[in-house]
């Protein structure tokens, strides 16, 4: 027995973890479990079985219950299966986040904006989860916690890449945004549609580079016009292209830099408006 709501059982010689409200209340070892009380059943992998057991025995029940509610809500909203390890990773993360909040310690996530744009459905669930946690536990979580939860959900989706791949994409996009801000000395208005178009374009560029696919091609005449007409934007894009070449060990062609420059030029009015708002 792990706690009143979770217990380890064996079926056909295979160890399983079953969960349900009060499923183990008043039970002793080897007592039968009522099938009608089982809400969830897991067959933990060899790698996470002991972690799962430890978390279920050491984490406050209200955290476990919240984690399971979030996972169930996410499964319904996203209509996708999750890897079983989400029950370990998310529960452990929430316990840590709540502990920090209770100690009034704030850990900021500098990638939160990129996560919001990249993983919108998961981020929306993260926002819902933050409100649920705050309401249930009477704590105040940092705004970025929605992004942290979103990343856990995204990486637990069985059809998606692992945490390392997702984090690399988020980190690269965050770095590219910061390069533009440093180059022009102004802050990007990330909620604008023009920035979203640039963000989406760069996300596709990174995906094509990762998959070894051909990037955009641009007519030489148009490329020459972009260099002349949008010289500053092209210089910024060229700097970003050189950085990506080093980071990804793949040359970014000049034509792709031209497309990046066009997107950068389109977001420059948003840069100026954002800077104006900050100076008021």
Model segments located where?
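A cross-family "folded-core" feature that marks the main globular domain of proteins
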Residues: 1-280
């Amino acid at each position: 027995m792990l706690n009143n709501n979770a217990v380890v059982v064996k079926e056909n010689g295979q160890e399983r973890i079953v969960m349900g409200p009060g499923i183990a209340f008043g039970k002793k070892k080897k007592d039968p479990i009522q099938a009608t009380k089982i809400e969830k059943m897991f067959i933990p992998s060899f790698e996470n079985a002991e972690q799962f057991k430890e978390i279920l025995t050491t984490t406050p029940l209200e955290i476990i219950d919240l984690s399971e509610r979030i996972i169930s809500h996410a499964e319904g909203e996203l209509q996708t299966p999750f890897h079983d390890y989400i029950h370990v990773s998310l529960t452990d993360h929430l316990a840590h986040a709540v502990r920090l909040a209770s100690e009034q310690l704030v850990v900021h996530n500098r990638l939160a904006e990129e996560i919001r744009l990249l993983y919108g459905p998961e981020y929306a669930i993260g926002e819902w989860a933050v409100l649920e946690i705050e309401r249930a536990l009477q704590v105040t979580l940092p705004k970025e916690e929605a992004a942290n939860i979103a990343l856990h959900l995204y990486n637990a989706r069985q059809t998606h890449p692992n945490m390392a791949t997702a984090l690399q994409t988020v980190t690269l996009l965050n770095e590219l945004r910061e390069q533009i801000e440093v180059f022009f000395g102004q802050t990007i208005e990330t909620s604008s549609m023009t920035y979203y178009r640039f963000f989406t374009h760069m996300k596709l560029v990174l995906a094509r580079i990762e998959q070894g696919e051909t990037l955009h091609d641009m007519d030489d005449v148009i490329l020459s016009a972009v260099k002349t007409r949008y010289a500053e934007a092209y210089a910024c894009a060229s700097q970003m292209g050189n950085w990506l070449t080093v980071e990804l060990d793949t040359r970014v062609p000049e034509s792709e830099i031209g497309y990046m420059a066009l997107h950068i030029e389109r977001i420059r009015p948003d840069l100026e408006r954002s800077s104006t708002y900050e100076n008021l």
